[in-house]
């Protein structure tokens, strides 16, 4: 099996899990518990962070493109992300959570963008945060492979993590859950160096 075909299969698996199974769990099991704690009440709503929140998509695409010609790195990273999404989906299936989002008047570009995110991204499947888990896993992976590139991604990842709270898509415990999931996956990264794939 050619490497190009394998890379496409890995990418399609990630897309299928995220756009298919993840969304299915959201629809089938839409109501969950609220994990908000006292700290969350002190975190302000900052609609401007909606732009940063959406940067995780081009970030992931760019990193995949960066490693497209390095099959070993591409394969390991893909398998790690598949594991992240799969574990998160299993958690959502048995422990559904939701965020109580504020009602925001669409008065400018940023509030309209935030409301658009609210419209298309349901307020459940929140613990652990996939935004946090995916971007953190990628940043750690890239930093180990290429420290200079990683040093660019780490600040962006930090801002993306903050954005999940500043636009009220996640609460603090969701962030902790996402970081823990990323840590477990990256700590066991050798598992994903499967030469047969």
Please identify what each model-predicted range represents.
Residues 115-197:
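Membrane-embedded catalytic cores of phosphoryl/pyrophosphoryl-handling enzymes
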Residues 1-60, 97, 105, 114:
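N-terminal transmembrane-helix/juxtamembrane module of multi-pass inner/ER membrane proteins
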Residues 13, 17, 79, 83, ...:
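Hydrophobic faces of alpha-helical transmembrane segments in multi-pass integral membrane proteins
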Residues 18-24, 85-93, 155-168:
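Aromatic-anchored segments of alpha-helical transmembrane domains
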Residues 3, 7, 42-46, 68-73, ...:
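Membrane-helix interfacial "entry" motifs
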Residues 27-39, 68-148:
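Membrane-interface loops
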Residues 50-63, 79-82, 86, 134:
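Hydrophobic alpha-helical transmembrane segments
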Residues 6-14, 75-83, 149-153, 173:
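Alpha-helical transmembrane segments of integral membrane proteins
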């Amino acid at each position: 099996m050619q490497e190009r075909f394998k890379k496409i299969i890995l990418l399609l698996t990630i897309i299928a899990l995220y756009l298919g199974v993840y969304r299915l769990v959201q629809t089938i099991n839409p109501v969950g518990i609220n994990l908000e704690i006292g700290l969350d009440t002190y975190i302000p709503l900052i609609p401007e962070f909606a732009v940063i929140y959406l940067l995780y998509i081009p970030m992931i695409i760019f990193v995949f493109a960066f490693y497209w010609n390095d099959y070993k790195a591409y394969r390991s990273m893909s398998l790690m992300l598949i594991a992240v999404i799969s574990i998160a989906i299993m958690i959502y299936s048995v422990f559904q959570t939701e965020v109580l989002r504020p009602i925001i008047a669409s008065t400018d570009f940023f509030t309209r963008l935030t409301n658009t995110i609210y419209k298309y991204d349901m307020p459940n499947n929140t613990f652990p945060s996939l935004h946090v888990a995916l971007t953190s896993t990628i940043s750690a992976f890239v930093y180990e492979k290429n420290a200079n590139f990683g040093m660019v991604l780490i600040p962006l990842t930090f801002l993306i993590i903050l954005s999940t709270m500043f636009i009220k898509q996640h609460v603090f415990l969701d962030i902790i859950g996402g970081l823990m999931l990323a840590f477990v996956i990256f700590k066991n990264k050798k598992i994903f160096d499967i030469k047969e794939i």
